[in-house]
Amino acid sequence: SAVMFDFVIVAFVSFASYKFKLPQLAYIAQILAFVAPLLTAGQTDAVFLFSYLLFISIATLFLAGITGWRKLIVFSLFFVGMYSVPYMGDFYFNSRYSNDAPIILNFAYLFSMLYLLSGIFAVIKKGVQEYETEIVLAVLNGLFLFMWIYNVAPAEWSSMIFAAWAVVFAFGSFTAFKFSSKLAPFYAYGAVAIAFIGAATSVELDGASLVIAFAMEALLILLCVLLLTKDTKAAGKAAMVFIFPVVLSFSSMMNYANSAELWSADFFALLLVAVALI
């Protein structure tokens, strides 16, 4: 088939890029590999398509692992994300994409785990030379996973799924710091974990309860960073998470100003935010 023929060409070009140490050839091979499904006639089965993308992504991770060309992984995630857009954006309409989206969601979990493990192993094995690449990879991976969960995962399970992935990324953040003592990957994966915690919380709560929960989570995050890194500068940067409860507290401030009650939920929300900031 056309896809197999393209795959043979891609394999040859990838080997040549490794043999002669030419990253430009690797990027060309990657583009050919990810564009190949678009060149086939007719509609490609969704499971076959994402199985193919998964195989190409694993091959990309292997090539990046032996060459150190980490930007290949970022481009790989970008292409997978582009193929995912129709399944995420069209899920609320009756089409072949919406029918296949719940199945492809499982592939999204596999992709995210692969990219996460790739980043962690790179940090543990030899450290990270280009922090910007790891930060971009972590952010894109988190955004990719967030969009899939938000648009496709069952609403009644979304908070639990966000919380579970928050634990996974938090563990990745801790592992990256423990074995490298580098703050860049710690911040990158930790930021994704914090975003997922916030997403899980916002799904379940609203109003003053959400402000209180965000303030408590921000305080807990700050304490965890201080205990893990024992670095006041790192804790100072982590204090940026207080932006979210502070911004949300403005609505509680307006509600409390217009309320006749003294000891209301909005009062305790404002009190907790004020104490946490002190």
Where do the protein language model's features map onto the residues?
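Extended, compositionally biased regions that are outside compact catalytic cores
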Residues: 1-191, 196-278
